[in-house]
Amino acid sequence: MSKRLAIVVVLVTLFLGTKPQSAWCQGYGTDTQNVMTPAAGGMAGVSVARPQDVPSAIFGNPATLAQFNGTQFTLGGGWVEGYPTVKNDGSANTTDNTPFSVTSRSEGFVVPAMGVTQDLRSLGLNGTLGLGLSGTSGLGAEYRGRVPESNILNNTSGEYMVLGMNVGAGFQLTDKFSVGAALTLGTAFEQLGLVGPAVSSAMVNDYGLRGNFGLNYDLNEANTVGAYYQTRMDFAFPDAVRIGSDYHDVRISQPETVGLGYANRSFMNGDLLLAADVYYKMWESAPLWEDIFVNQWAFAVGSQLTRGKMKYRLGYSYNTNPINHNVGNSLDGFPYAQANVQLFQAASTAVINQHRLTAGIGRQGFLIPNLDLDLYAGGLFNASDMFGTHTEASVAIYYVGMGLTWRYGDCCRSPQ
C-alpha cells in the first residue's frame, strides 16, 4: 500500500512540475476564480458559501476557512487547452488585402492548486489558518509566421500569467457567523505581443498584493450564505514596451471582485449539496483591461451527491461577455489605431466564452483512510464574436484536473 501511495505522490508531483506553456484563460475574463480546484472544478467553481476543497476556501471566501477542522493538505492541479482562431478580411494588412484565418499554436499549461489548513482551536482560537499556491490568472496566444507578412499578427506572440500565494484565516465569531481575511502575493509574467507603435520588449515580471475579506452565515442547519470582496491586484511591468528608442512601463491590474454564495444541504438526508455563486468583476477600473473589457457578471450552480465514500459532482456557469465593442484608440495610454486595438482583442484577449459545463468525482479513503482523491473535467462551449467590422475570433476551452487531500485530526471527511 505504501508503494502505491508513493507512486501516486510522484506522479502528481511530476504533473505539477511540468513547465507551463502559454494557452488561454478558462475562468471569467483573465481570472480563474476557483474553476480548477480539485472539488470545485467539478462544480463550475462554486465555493463561496461551502467550499468542498482546501484551495477553494483559501483562494475564495476566507471566512469559510473556519469550516475546516484538524489539519488538511491538498496537492492538486489541472491542464487547460484553448486554441483561438482569428479571421480578418485583409483590411488589417498594410500592403495588401489578402484575407486570412489563423489558429494559435500555443500549447496547454498546468494550473496548480495547492493548500494547507490548520485548525487553531487547540490554541484557544476558534478558527483556521490557511496557506496556498495557485494559478490565479492567465492567457496567451502565438501566430508568428502564419499570416500575411504585412499584418502585425505575423510577429505576435503573447503571454500573461499570474501565480498567487495566499495566506488567510477564518474565525467563528458565533455558532452561525464567521469572518475571514486573506492576503495574496502575486507574481506575474507579461509579454502581450504588442506590435507598433508600442512594441513589446521582452517577457518581464512584477509582483502585486491583493486583499480578500469575507463573511459566512448559517441561516439554519441546512442553509448557508457567504460573501467576499477582493481588492484590485496591481502590476507595473518595467520597460515592457518600446516606442522608438525609449522604453516604458505597462500597467495591468486584476479587477476588484465581489462574490456572493448560497448552499443548501436539506435534501437526501444531507447527502445532496446544492450551491450557487454570483460574481461581479470590475474590469472598467483595472488598468489595461479597462481599455478592452467591460464589467462582468458571472453565475454558477453546482451539486455534489455523496454515496458512501463516493462523491459525484456537476456544475454549470454562465457569464456575460466582457468584451468592449466600443474601444478607443489606446492601450494603457499608448496610442493605437482602433482597428489594431480590435485585432489585439481578437487575437490575444478574446475571453468570449459564456457557457461552462463541468463534472467531477471524489473518493474518500483512497489507498489509505485519511487520503481523498478528486478528479474533474470541464469545458467552455465554442463561441465567436466580431471585433469591429473586419475581424472575428472563435475559441473553445477544455480542462481536466485532480487533487489528493490528506486529512488529520478532527476531520474524517471534507466539509458538506
Model-derived features: where do they sit?
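Short, solvent-exposed beta-strand-terminating loops
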Residues: 75-88, 188, 234, 321-327
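N-terminal secretory signal peptides that target proteins for export/translocation
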Residues: 1-3
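C-terminal segment of classical bacterial N-terminal signal peptides
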Residues: 14-23
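Sec-dependent N-terminal signal peptides
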Residues: 5-14
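Outer membrane beta-barrel transmembrane domains
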Residues: 29, 96, 205, 209-416
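N-terminal, post-signal peptide beta-strand-biased segments of exported outer-membrane/organellar beta-barrel
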Residues: 22-129, 133, 340, 347-352
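Transmembrane beta-barrel wall of Gram-negative outer-membrane proteins
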Residues: 101-230
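Solvent-exposed, glycine/polar-rich loop segments of beta-barrel outer-membrane systems
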Residues: 90-100, 149-152, 194-202, 239-249, ...
